[in-house]
Regions:
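Conserved beta-loop-beta/alpha segment of the NTase-like Rossmann-fold superfamily
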Residues: 1-38, 64-66, 72-75
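N-terminal glycine-rich phosphate-binding loop and ensuing alpha1 helix
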Residues: 5-6, 114, 170
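Catalytic-core segments of class I nucleotidyltransferases/pyrophosphorylases
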Residues: 12-13, 41-141, 152-153
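Preference for short coil/turn "hinge" residues that link or interrupt alpha-helices
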Residues: 18, 24-27, 129, 141-142, ...
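Generic detection of intrinsically disordered/low-complexity segments and helix-coil linkers/edges
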Residues: 25, 56-57, 160
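Short, amphipathic alpha-helical "recognition" segments used to contact nucleic acids or chromatin
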Residues: 145
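Short, amphipathic C-terminal "tail helix"
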Residues: 148-173
Length: 173
């Protein structure tokens, strides 16, 4: 979707609290969900609820301030014996420091949480790359476009990978 980079930068620049993202799905019971009040403020978060109160999930992209360390130290293992990221988000919500950025429907999020979903996600990425002739999330391409690396550095990376399709892609940028 358009504007993701700006949203990520805004989330990363916040000095206080946490920012997570909300994404609308048709099958929220498979995910951690977030419920909103009438003003769009998060009022509950549940992990894989049997009866979801919302269709908005939290797809696993989190930005936390430094207090996350103190929050994490205070966590207790769940029934599964694990520390849950959902509990971190709930603590920020209780403190009034959780911001949920809703992603519009033009954003694409792919669930890769099962083997079948991972395969399906890979096929979607392949199809988009084949149709557009551009790689998705190519770190060297992004770094070069943003001026973080020089053309010389880009070509050096391409040379190191010259026997691969990826290396040839980098050479053509």
């Amino acid at each position: 979707g358009q504007g993701l980079t700006n949203r990520l930068r805004a989330a990363a620049s916040k000095e206080k609290g946490a920012t997570v993202f909300g994404y609308y799905v048709d099958d929220p019971e498979r995910f951690g969900i977030v419920e909103f009040d009438g003003d769009g403020k998060a009022i509950s978060i549940e992990e894989k609820p049997r009866y979801p109160k919302s269709n908005y999930i939290i797809p696993g992209l989190y930005f936390y301030d430094n207090s996350v360390m103190e929050i994490a130290r205070g966590l207790k293992p769940s029934a599964r014996g694990e520390l849950e990221i959902t509990d971190v988000n709930i603590e920020y919500m209780k403190r009034g420091q959780l911001h949920v950025e809703k992603l519009d429907r033009d954003f694409v999020w792919l669930d890769a949480g099962t083997a079948d979903n991972l395969l399906e996600s890979a096929q979607v990425v392949r199809r988009v790359q084949d149709e557009t002739g551009r790689y998705i999330a190519c770190p060297e391409e992004i770094a070069y476009a943003r001026g973080y690396i020089s053309r010389q550095t880009l070509l050096r990376h391409a040379e190191e990978l010259n026997k691969t399709l990826y290396g040839r892609y980098l050479e053509c940028l």
